[in-house]
């Protein structure tokens, strides 16, 4: 299967803030018309984030053939969920997900409670023929006893209600191969995020091999402290085995999209996207 490529709009967040119309048109000009939103103001807003209004979104989707193939929601709560899903369905989006979660070290009961919550969200989405997905960072690969949090989430969540969007970069940063995860849980993944890791990064690829203790209590302040812009690279410019990742993802039965997500760009955001897109064109099993 040739994998369709899209983009998580967080990759161009600063460009969107300055010129949303110009940015979305620039992405469409590159052929990037499959977009994933990131609504970080879900307490008060229903859309795809970045200040993009519903009217403008409808207009540019119609004029440029853009489709919204997913949207991360933060904060994620049951009270606002029906209203948010109403909006997403109106724009033709059938997937919503969480963007970031933290788990107090060793607290298995907390993991279970969050898994139960994800099942509830997934059930509400499924009642509308929509999907709920879980997006990871590195902290899900911390071991709580003999299993990682990610393994526990796979175990505690209902496969029919909770899908997964694997951020392959962050899996490596947690010391786990995304290829192994694809092979271990082939039915669970519907999308993935792709970026790269520079060869000259100041710290090891696996954060647990250097700056992070195995028993660290990871929260947002620590995450932000560990997030180093110099440790991100455009697709095809670093050391990650991206063709192998693509090949593994292409074999998954429920997998739909590989999304470029550049947490930090080496230069201007749209130039960064162009660099990654040109790299994607050189890989096999890719559909632009």
Residue ranges and their predicted role:
Residues 25, 34, 63, 67-164, ...:
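Active-site acidic/histidine proton-transfer and metal-coordination neighborhood
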Residues 17-18, 45-51, 143-144:
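Conserved glycine-rich "GG(E/T)P / GGGxP" loop and the immediately following alpha-helix
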Residues 11-13, 39-41, 74-77, 102-104, ...:
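Active-site-proximal loop/turn and secondary-structure-junction residues that shape catalytic pockets
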Residues 35-59:
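Glycine-rich, proline-tolerant flexible connector loops at the mouths of alpha/beta enzymes
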Residues 16, 50, 76-77, 114, ...:
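Charged, low-complexity surface patches
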Residues 1-33, 62, 89-92, 147-166, ...:
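Histidine-acidic metal/acid-base catalytic patches
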Residues 12-13, 46-47, 74, 110-111, ...:
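A generic secondary-structure micro-motif detector
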